[in-house]
C-alpha cells in the first residue's frame, strides 16, 4: 500500500514542514522540477508526497483521499464535521502558531467576557430588533463556541470573504471571530480580544485520516514515531 502525505505547497509552512521531515529521516524530494506538485520521500519507496494548499490538505485528509497531512489545526477543526472521529492529530509540530479569537470594538468598554457578550446579544434583539452580527470565516468553530460552550443563541454569522477585521468599521458586522498571531492587526482596527474569547490555540499539526486500511500497517506507526522523535 502506498501512503500519501500532503504537505503545504509554498511559503514558510512548506519550509518548516520539510525541515521537520528531514530531521526525522524523511527527506522530501520533488518529482520533476521545484515547481512540481508531487514529491517522494528519499529512501521510503511506499510513501509519496502531494503539495497542496493548507485548506486543500484539510479537505483531502478529511475525505481520506490522502493518508497524512500537515496543516493548521484551525483549518482541520473548521473544515471537518465530527473531526475527532475522522482524523487523528498525530503530532503538534511547533510552528504556525495562531489563535482563533472573539474580538469586539474597543469602545465596548463594559464588554470583556463571553458572559458580557451574551448580555449584549440579548440587548441587541430587544433594542434593534436584530441579532448580533458576527463576521467570520470560521462558522463551525463560532457556532460550537457561542452556542455549545457559552449558550449564546441570539446571533447571526456573516460570511467574511475579505479582511474580517474591517467588518465592524464598515458596518457589515458588529464583532468578529478571526485568527491572529500577534493581535496587532486587531489593535490597528480598534478591536480587543475578550478575556475568555480564545476559541482555539492553533498550530501546524501532522494529521492522519482514520482509515481501516491503516490498522496494523507498520508504515503508519513508523511515520508517526519518526516525526514525533524530532519534536
Curated annotation (Swiss-Prot):
Keyword Nucleotide-binding carried by entry: yes
Principal subcellular localisation of the protein: cytoplasm
PROSITE patterns assigned to the protein according to its UniProt record, in alphabetical order: ATP_P_PHORIBOSYLTR (PS01316)
Pathway: Amino-acid biosynthesis; L-histidine biosynthesis; L-histidine from 5-phospho-alpha-D-ribose 1-diphosphate: step 1/9
Compartment(s) of residence: Cytoplasm
Matching Gene3D superfamilies: Periplasmic binding protein-like II
Single Gene Ontology MF annotation: ATP binding
EC number: 2.4.2.17
Record keyword Endoplasmic reticulum present: no
InterPro entries found in the cross-reference section: ATP_PRibTrfase_cat, ATP_PRibTrfase_CS, ATP_PRibTrfase_HisG
Coiled-coil blocks: none
Keywords, sorted A to Z: Amino-acid biosynthesis, ATP-binding, Cytoplasm, Glycosyltransferase, Histidine biosynthesis, Nucleotide-binding, Transferase
One Pfam family linked to the record: HisG
Entry's Gene Ontology BP terms: L-histidine biosynthetic process
Catalyzed reactions: 1-(5-phospho-beta-D-ribosyl)-ATP + diphosphate = 5-phospho-alpha-D-ribose 1-diphosphate + ATP
Enzyme class: transferase
Assigned GO CC terms: cytoplasm
PANTHER family in the cross-refs: ATP PHOSPHORIBOSYLTRANSFERASE, ATP PHOSPHORIBOSYLTRANSFERASE ATP-PRTASE
Domain comment (free text): Lacks the C-terminal regulatory region which is replaced by HisZ.
Functional summary from the UniProt entry: Catalyzes the condensation of ATP and 5-phosphoribose 1-diphosphate to form N'-(5'-phosphoribosyl)-ATP (PR-ATP). Has a crucial role in the pathway because the rate of histidine biosynthesis seems to be controlled primarily by regulation of HisG enzymatic activity.
Subunit architecture: Heteromultimer composed of HisG and HisZ subunits.
Family: Belongs to the ATP phosphoribosyltransferase family. Short subfamily.
Descriptive protein name: ATP phosphoribosyltransferase
Origin species: Sinorhizobium fredii (strain NBRC 101917 / NGR234)
Amino acid at each position: 500500500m502506498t501512503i500519501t502525505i500532503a504537505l503545504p505547497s509554498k511559503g514558510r509552512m512548506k519550509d518548516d514542514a520539510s525541515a521537520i521531515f528531514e530531521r526525522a529521516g524523511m527527506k522530501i524530494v520533488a518529482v520533476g522540477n521545484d515547481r512540481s506538485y508531487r514529491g517522494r520521500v528519499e529512501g521510503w519507496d511506499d510513501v509519496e508526497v502531494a503539495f497542496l494548499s493548507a485548506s486543500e490538505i484539510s479537505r483531502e485528509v478529511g475525505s481520506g483521499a490522502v493518508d497524512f497531512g500537515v496543516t493548521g489545526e484551525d483549518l482541520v477543526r473548521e473544515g471537518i464535521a465530527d473531526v475527532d472521529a475522522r482524523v487523528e492529530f498525530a503530532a503538534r509540530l511547533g510552528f504556525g502558531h495562531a489563535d482563533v479569537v472573539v474580538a469586539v470594538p474597543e469602545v465596548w468598554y463594559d464588554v470583556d467576557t463571553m458572559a458580557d457578550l451574551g448580555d449584549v446579544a440579548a440587548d441587541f434583539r430587544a433594542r434593534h430588533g436584530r441579532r448580533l452580527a458576527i463576521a467570520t470565516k470560521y462558522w463551525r468553530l463560532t457556532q460550537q463556541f457561542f452556542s455549545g460552550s457559552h449558550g449564546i443563541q441570539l446571533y447571526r454569522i456573516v460570511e467574511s470573504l475579505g479582511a474580517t477585521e474591517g467588518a465592524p468599521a464598515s458596518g457589515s458586522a458588529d464583532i468578529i471571530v478571526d485568527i491572529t498571531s500577534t493581535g496587532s492587526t486587531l489593535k490597528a482596527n480598534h478591536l480587543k480580544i475578550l478575556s475568555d474569547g480564545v476559541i482555539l490555540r492553533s498550530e501546524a499539526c501532522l494529521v492522519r485520516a482514520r482509515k481501516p486500511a491503516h490498522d496494523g500497517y507498520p508504515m503508519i506507526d513508523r511515520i508517526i514515531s519518526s516525526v514525533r522523535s524530532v519534536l
